[in-house]
Design a protein with these regions (language model features):
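Short, non-transmembrane alpha-helical segments in secretory-pathway proteins
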Residues: 21-47, 96-108
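C-terminal motif of bacterial Sec signal peptides marking the signal peptidase cleavage site
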Residues: 16-17
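A short, surface-exposed beta-strand/turn
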Residues: 69-93
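Exposed beta-strand-loop-beta-strand "reactive/processing" segments of non-cytosolic proteins
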Residues: 42-76
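Metal-dependent nuclease catalytic core centered on acidic motifs
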Residues: 85-198, 207-226, 230-235
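Positively charged n-region of N-terminal signal peptides that target proteins for export
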Residues: 1-5
């Protein structure tokens, strides 16, 4: 309650323009934490706060009991009380990524995928326990649009079958970069990075010596898989 009162006072000062000095970093942290805790009834940690030249503030946040569930939180305008966040979208992304890995496991492969969902619009009243099919059906053009790793050599046809199975079960399309890593040490190092940040760039993946790179696209059960050579060229 004390935290909420302090945050409200700081917000009022900012909106009223009572101070010529920008709010300090810890004030932005408190404002975002209070917003998230009131909205989701959970404790959160906010870090990496950056004030942008356009008057917005961007931060990274995660639940206090799950440091791997990292998401973006934004104050669009420091002179207004609004805060936006990607918490539910990120949590749903983790669930879809885990569901894709579960199907991969049925085909005999260990894998790990990032948690990024792209959509024109997402189900507005979803929470982190919303049914996966329901979420996809009530979102517009939603896809699991991210990168991931597979441990062991895999054929393009197998990836295509996994993508089809995923779409048929969850009604969610995919657009994936898949890095095939056969060295177990490199695979587990990449897996730890993905677990911590929920994403893997091509430059980061290159440090783990992928044997193959595949691009997987599946929409409305029309699935294509192409092999990429790491320089933007595909087979």
């Amino acid at each position: 309650m004390i935290k909420k009162i302090i945050a409200m006072c700081l917000c009022c000062i900012s909106v009223a323009g009572c101070s010529a000095m920008p709010m300090r970093r810890d004030a932005y942290v408190l404002r975002i934490e209070t917003y998230l805790e009131d909205k989701y009834n959970e404790d959160f940690v906010v870090s990496k706060v950056q004030r942008r030249t356009d008057g917005s503030v961007h931060a990274i946040a995660y639940p206090a009991d799950d440091s791997n569930a990292v998401f973006d939180a934004v104050i669009p305008d420091v002179n207004k009380p609004d805060v936006s966040d990607e918490y539910i979208k990120t949590m749903m992304g983790h669930r879809y990524a885990n569901a894709f890995s579960e199907i991969m496991h049925k085909y005999g492969y260990d894998s790990k995928f990032g948690a990024l969902i792209w959509a024109d619009s997402v189900m507005p009243d979803a929470d982190k326990t919303t049914d996966l099919q329901e979420y996809a059906d009530n979102s517009e053009n939603a896809k699991l649009n991210t990168s991931g790793i597979v441990n062991g050599h895999i054929a393009a046809d197998t990836l295509q079958n996994v993508a089809k199975d995923f779409y048929n079960k969850y009604h969610m399309g995919v657009s994936l970069f898949v890095y095939v890593i056969t060295d177990s040490g490199d695979y587990h190092s990449a897996e730890r990075l993905l677990s911590s940040y929920g994403r893997l760039t091509m430059a980061e993946a290159a440090t783990y010596n992928p044997d193959d790179i595949f691009i997987v696209n599946c929409d409305n059960n029309r699935c294509q898989v192409r092999k990429e050579d790491g320089y933007g060229n595909t087979d």
